[in-house]
């Protein structure tokens, strides 16, 4: 299966490396795409070593392939964004395409798998919840964050699911109908 893994700029971005490894070990072709802020939290090289592909980001050379976002959206059997920050969630909810990942997501013609990760107060914010409901109504598959100790020191709902849980929900459970449902 051809999989796009979108990595956004949050502290939980390091977990995407394990998710990449799980997918590659299972025989999936994985193309990692970073948002500009992902670079502040994780390095590209480990993702490139595991996936065997160059990580694409907003600095992708559009001159060598000006419609790369369309080509990749057509190539992908599945698009997973893990972690999904409140910032990128808002962009997706309102159709903003200001970086390579959000542009690719708009071009993809199937449901996105969205694994949320953010501070508990951000997650509870009315605007974040409205964006979440909008994405659910559009048919995207929401992998809700778990509760526990967060990077900020708070305890609450906002932790990115463990990579093994994300993998299971995205691949082992694909026969179930998750259309517009909040998983977990």
Describe each model-derived feature in a short phrase.
Residues 1-113, 120-184:
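A cross-family phosphate/adenosyl-ligand binding-site feature
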